[in-house]
A protein has these predicted regions:
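FAD-binding core/adjacent interface of flavoenzyme oxidoreductases
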Residues: 1-7, 75-144, 251-255, 259
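Beta1-alpha1 glycine-rich phosphate/pyrophosphate-binding loop at the start
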Residues: 5-59, 151-177
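Short, well-ordered coil/turn residues at beta-beta hairpins
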Residues: 11, 109-111, 116-118, 149, ...
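A conserved FAD-binding loop/helix module that cradles the flavin
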Residues: 20, 156-158, 267-307
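Anion (oxyanion) recognition and catalysis
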Residues: 24, 69, 124, 163, ...
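A Rossmann-like FAD-binding core segment of flavoenzymes
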Residues: 62, 68-95, 100-101, 166-250, ...
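FAD-site-proximal beta/loop scaffold in flavoenzymes
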Residues: 124-140, 230-276, 286, 293
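Rossmann-fold dinucleotide-binding core
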Residues: 132-142, 146-149, 155-159, 165-166
Length: 307
């Protein structure tokens, strides 16, 4: 097959990119698909990644692309809409223009997308003063007035966690009551406020949160919000091809990022609960090494079968 790739990678975040550099350095024929919409696109800086503290996600991607292209990895900037495995074990990938590509191995690293509350101001503040991970953005709100938005989910754990970074924490339920009586009692002991008024909007200036405006006209000053509203797969590619999923909606993988489908790997946020850039990159590296080892083994077996 003339245009058979060793590996096709779907997803151009840290997991897909790190797998690409590993495989490129192994002289593998690699094609990487990217839509340019990473989960942290609107973030003002990455953290917990040594030597890259507070780098803009776009700057990180540019550095990564420049490095990877040195090793012959090909890029296509288009969405992949489906993938399947044929009877000969070859993966067939189809893009949104209905063009197909073929590979021996497939790595899906498309990540997750956050369910941003559908309240005026949330989307505009997301990545600036509205966040979902205190380990990623907690330092930047140290000592400030921080709110936890938890209508659809129980926000107890996140509220307690934020006390590590600031003494001023309030849990906002937006009219819901997901808290257990014992949790309410504990929050009071931790000096964490509970606000049940329903949200009308976030008052902000260019994404800088100023106040929470409630229905009825009341308001409360607030510097930043962390929300607990769940997430979903950015695309359902892994699920649709038959990968097993966890109850939390992430793809089940083994220690080498392999799935229940032979030759198919998933790395990054799409497969794990700990959503750090550095963890996603490490998973991509693990997947890359395992994929190369499988390709080595298959090549040797093919040579032995010929002799």
């Amino acid at each position: 097959m003339q245009n058979l790739y060793d590996v096709i990678i779907v997803g151009g975040g840290p997991a897909g990119l790190n797998a690409a550099v590993v495989l490129g350095r192994c002289h593998r024929k690699v094609l990487l698909f990217d839509t340019g919409q990473p989960r942290n696109l609107h973030s003002e800086g990455m953290h917990n990644y040594l030597t890259r503290d507070h780098i803009l996600p776009t700057a990180f991607l540019k550095i990564a692309h420049d490095e990877i292209k040195k090793y012959g990895v090909q890029f296509r900037y288009i969405q992949i809409i489906k993938a399947h495995k044929d009877g000969k074990g070859i993966f067939i990938i189809t893009d949104r223009k209905n063009k197909t590509y073929h590979s021996k191995k497939l790595l899906i690293a498309t990540g997750l997308t956050d369910n941003i509350p559908a309240i005026d101001g949330f989307k505009e503040c997301y990545g600036k003063t509205v966040h979902h991970c205190p380990y990623c953005d907690g330092w930047e709100v140290s000592g400030k007035s921080v709110g936890i938005y938890a209508k659809e989910k129980n926000g107890f754990d996140l509220a307690v966690s934020l006390k590590t970074w600031t003494p001023s924490v309030t849990l906002y339920t937006d009219g819901a009551s997901n808290l257990k009586p014992s949790q309410i009692k504990s929050l009071k002991k931790y000096n964490i406020g509970i606000e049940t008024n329903t949200f009308q909007k976030l008052q902000h200036k260019k994404g800088r949160l100023q106040k929470i405006i409630f229905n009825g006209g009341d308001s409360k000053d607030c510097d930043a919000i962390f929300f607990v509203n769940g997430f979903q797969q950015q695309v359902d590619l892994a699920k649709n091809i038959g990968c097993k999923m966890s109850d939390k909606g992430v793809v089940l993988t083994n220690k080498s990022q392999g799935t229940n489908i032979s030759g198919l790997f998933v790395a990054g946020d799409a497969s794990k609960d700990m959503h750090f850039v550095v963890v996603a990159a490490a998973e991509g590296a693990k997947a890359g090494v395992t994929i190369n080892k499988e390709l080595q083994k298959e090549s040797l077996e093919a040579l032995l079968n010929k002799s």
